[in-house]
Each structure stands twice: as structure tokens, then as C-alpha cells.
Amino acid sequence: MQALKVPPKKILIVGGTRFSGLYLWEELHNRGHEVTLFNRGKTALKKLPGESDAAFEKRKSETQFVKGDRKNHAEMTEKLGSLKFDVVYDMGGREESDTASLVDMFGKTADQFVYMSSAGVYKKSLTMPHMEGDAEDPKSRHKGKLETEAMLRLRGVPFTSIRPTYIYGPLNYNPLDEWFFTRLDAGKKLCIPGHGQHLTGLGHVKDLAVAMANVVGRDHTKGKIYNVQDTQSVTFEGLAKLCAQAMGKKADEVEIKLYDKKMFDFGEKKAFPMREQHFFCGVENAMRDLDWKPQFDMVKGLKDSYENDFKLKKAAGKLNLDFETDDMIINDQRIKAQMFDAIPKSG
């Protein structure tokens, strides 16, 4: 879809050097906005996949960088307090206190305040997909984001909150699709908890960046919350097959071993990268209000991750090849290995 034609804005991104913020920075810069990044400056700036050296250097030269710790209120105020911005993006606030300092400075002066929340705030439900307005879980590990949204509303900030499900794509530091790629590449069975048919929602990071950038200039998004993910969801088994497809492997040869996680003690290790439940959202509101439509279906998106991230990490020797939890499951004689289709046959 065409981006809304808005004049260049002065935009602050708090965060912006790890993953989703990087893509948002590029998207906003490419639209002609004047971007300032505020972060600790500890993460080296990365060129995005497909970006030329010249484009990367141009983006850096046309961006203002301010170093500081967002958790140090005095330092943040000293570094940013005298600056003026039309739009503020908070990409990394986890607790209300993290965002309160930004609100103190820009809550009354910025025209728009965009907050990166999470679909993880929704309460587990018998009816799906999760929609904006559904019951939320005050005990969620993302409860800080819920409290932040409440604070933004209470203080009258012209905010828009974005709730993505699982974000994937090149440069992701959270090994979601990489977990599947690594095991498929090593010829391992894929150990999936439960019955393997839990539906989950994923969204490509580039699609997320476009959705977030599309908030700029759309006054009707103020005070609203939007889910963001792909228009379709996928079962765990289906994701395993799609990852194989992205790697050029035969999906019907993927070997899956289902297990009951209650049978095992994995200690501090995480045996599977996703929550064992249905977890996906409806995105109709974002598509309508943000004039947005995901450009990456899962096959295209996973291939992008495989070609532009996994293969590079493998060549650089940066993959996590710890299969201890996998071997515990695979070697457990209480569980039978099975081959499964991604979608159960009806009838």
C-alpha cells in the first residue's frame, strides 16, 4: 500500500539498534523524516539485508545519535530535554517507569507517541483470534506494558500502541525460526510440545516497521491499540514444514517428536521457543486504520530469514548448537517418534 503523504517530521526513536527499531529507522528515513536515535550506543550499527553500503552510510549521516541510559532519568532529561520532536517512538520500554521519563519530556509537546507493546498481554482465551479490547492478563510477564498503556491513557498522551505477536526476520536476536532452521540443518528431529496443532501468529519485521511508520500523520490512531502480525497463523507442525520448505528441503520428510513438557526438567534451558497455546491475533483494525497490509506471507518471510540471516550466522559460526534438551526428549523411551502432516486430514 502507498504510504500517507506527510511532510517530513522530527522523530525520536528510543532504541533502534537491535532488531525492530533498526527496520523502523530505515523505513522512517526512507520516507524523508528527520530521525534521532537515543540509546546506550553499546550495539554496533548494522546494515540491513539488501541495503547498499552507500545507502547505509547515507542513513547514518542523516541521522542524529544521542547516547544515554533511558533508566537514568536525569541523564535522559539532560540529553533530550531541550530537543523538540513531532513523533516519539518508544521501542524498548518494559515497565511504566521506563516510559514515564519520556512522557514527562514529550507527553504534552509531541503530536504523536508510538509505544511498542506486545500481544503477550492478552489473557489466554477460549475464543480466538485475540482482538483489541479482549481481556488482558495482569499477571502476564508483559504486565509492565499493560501498566504503561494505562499510564499513557491516564496522562492524556496522544499515544498509539502496537501489539505484535512473534516478530521474525533477519537480525532477530530471539531465535524463533532459527530454532527450527538449526535443527533441520543438523538433521535433528524437531521436538514440539503438546499435540503440535497449536496455532501461533508471526509477523515479519519489515511489515511491522511499515505498520509503525504508517502511524505518522494519522490522527485517528491516537488513543488506539493495534495488533500486528501476518494475516494468517500457523500450527507448530506447520511452521516446521514451512521452515523446511524455505531451506529447500522436502516438507513431508520433516520428522517431529511430540512430548509432554511436564515429563521433563530442563532446568533453566528453554526447550522450545514459543508458548504452548493458541496465540494469534486479528489485524483487521490495523489494516483499516493504518492503510496497511503485510507484504510477507510466511513462505516468503521464512525464506528471507533463512537466506539473509541463518546462512550468514552458520558461515560465521554463530549458531547455538546446544541440543541437550532435544536429546533428552529424543532419547526418552516413553515417547514415540512420529511423522505428521502440517494440517490434519479431515474425515
List where the protein language model places each region.
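N-terminal Rossmann NAD(P)H-binding glycine-rich loop of SDR-like oxidoreductase domains
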Residues: 11-33
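N-terminal Rossmann-fold cofactor-binding loop
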Residues: 38-42, 69-70
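Rossmann-fold cofactor-recognition segment
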Residues: 56-72, 87, 92-94
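NAD(P)-cofactor binding segment of oxidoreductase domains
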Residues: 81-128, 143-154
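Short-chain dehydrogenase/reductase
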Residues: 128-149, 174-178, 201-202, 233, ...
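Conserved beta-loop-beta element that borders a ligand/cofactor-binding pocket
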Residues: 149-171
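Substrate-positioning beta->alpha
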Residues: 175-180, 194-216, 223-224, 238
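Mid/C-terminal beta-alpha module of Rossmann-like enzyme folds, strongest
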Residues: 214-278, 283, 289, 299, ...
